[in-house]
C-alpha cells in the first residue's frame, strides 16, 4: 500500500531551496527501502524488491533482471525534484496514447451513488457533467455480476443488465451522444469469495494454506501469475 519512493534531504530543505535526492522504485510489488549512516557519516540508501519473502531460483544459463530505480537530484528544493521526476516519467515511462495529451476532466459516480444506481441516475449525472463542460463520465464499482455491496460479485466481470436497465452499449451511446467520453471501473487484482469466479477457481486467490487469509474490503488478492490475468483481460474486452 505504500509508495515505493523515498527522499533524502537536508534538514533545512524547503519547496524552493536546498538539496534533496529521491529514489523511485519502478515496480508495483513488495519493496524494501533502507537508509543507513555509517561510521564515516556517509549515508547509504538501498531500495529494491522486498527480500523478506522473495526468492528466485535460476537455472544454468538463465538470468534475472531486477526492476529499475529512478534517481533524482535537486539543488532547488522539493518542487524542482518533483518537476524533474515528472518530466523523466512522462518522457521515458508512459507509453500509452496519453503520453503527451492533456488528461480529461471527469466525474465518477461512486461518491454520488456507491452501489445504489441505475441507468436513470447515471444519465442524470452525465447531463450535469455535460452542462459543466466536463469531458468524461466514469462508471464505478457495481456495474457487474451480483454486486450490490462489497461482500460479493468482485471478479464476475459480466454486465448486470438488470441494474443498468439495458445493455452497457446502450448506456455508453447515450453518454457519447451528450458529447462525453465513457470510462469503466475495474479492480482486476481482487476477488470476492462470494463470486462465481472464486467458486470456480478458489486456487486463484492469494492465500497461505492453513492460515486465516487477510481480507481488505471483504476481498482477497488474486495471484496474477495464474490464468486469472487472461480471464480478466478477456472479460474486459467482452465488456
Each language-model region and where it sits:
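Aromatic-lined carbohydrate-binding/catalytic grooves of carbohydrate-active enzymes
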Residues: 100-230
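Intrinsic disorder/low-complexity signal
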Residues: 9, 139, 236-237
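Generic short alpha-helical hydrophobic face used as a protein-protein interaction/packing hotspot
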Residues: 65, 111, 179, 236-237
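N-terminal accessory beta-strand-rich subdomains and adjacent acidic, glycine-rich linkers
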Residues: 1-89
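Long, charged amphipathic helices and adjacent flexible linkers at domain junctions
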Residues: 89-98
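A generic structural signal for short, solvent-exposed coil/turn residues
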Residues: 15, 25, 37-41, 48-50, ...
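Single conserved hydrophobic/aromatic residue that forms the stacking wall/gate
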Residues: 231-239
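Hydrophobic positions within alpha-helical membrane elements
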Residues: 66-67, 145, 239
Amino acid at each position: 500500500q505504500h509508495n515505493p519512493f523515498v527522499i533524502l534531504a537536508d534538514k533545512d530543505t524547503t519547496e524552493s531551496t536546498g538539496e534533496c535526492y529521491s529514489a523511485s522504485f519502478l515496480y508495483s510489488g513488495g519493496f524494501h527501502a533502507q537508509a543507513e549512516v555509517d561510521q564515516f557519516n556517509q549515508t547509504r540508501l538501498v531500495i529494491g524488491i522486498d527480500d523478506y519473502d522473495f526468492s528466485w531460483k535460476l537455472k544454468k544459463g538463465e538470468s534475472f533482471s531486477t526492476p529499475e530505480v529512478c534517481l533524482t537530484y535537486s539543488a532547488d528544493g522539493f518542487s524542482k525534484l518533483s518537476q524533474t521526476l515528472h518530466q523523466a516519467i512522462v518522457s521515458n515511462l508512459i507509453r500509452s496514447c496519453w503520453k503527451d495529451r492533456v488528461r480529461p476532466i471527469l466525474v465518477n459516480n461512486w461518491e454520488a451513488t456507491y452501489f445504489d444506481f441505475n441507468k436513470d441516475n447515471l444519465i442524470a449525472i452525465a447531463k450535469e457533467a455535460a452542462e459543466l463542460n466536463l469531458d468524461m463520465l466514469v462508471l464505478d464499482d457495481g456495474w457487474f455480476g451480483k454486486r450490490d455491496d462489497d461482500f460479493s460479485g468482485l471478479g464476475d466481470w459480466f454486465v448486470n443488465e438488470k441494474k443498468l436497465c439495458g445493455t452497457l452499449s446502450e448506456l455508453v451511446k447515450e453518454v457519447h451522444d451528450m458529447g462525453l467520453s465513457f470510462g469503466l471501473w475495474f479492480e482486476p487484482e481482487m476477488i470476492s469469495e462470494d463470486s462465481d469466479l472464486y467458486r470456480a477457481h478458489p486456487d486463484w486467490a492469494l492465500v497461505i494454506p492453513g492460515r486465516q487469509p487477510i481480507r481488505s474490503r471483504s476481498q482477497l488478492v488474486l495471484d496474477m501469475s495464474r490464468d486469472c490475468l487472461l480471464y480478466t483481460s478477456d472479460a474486459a474486452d467482452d465488456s
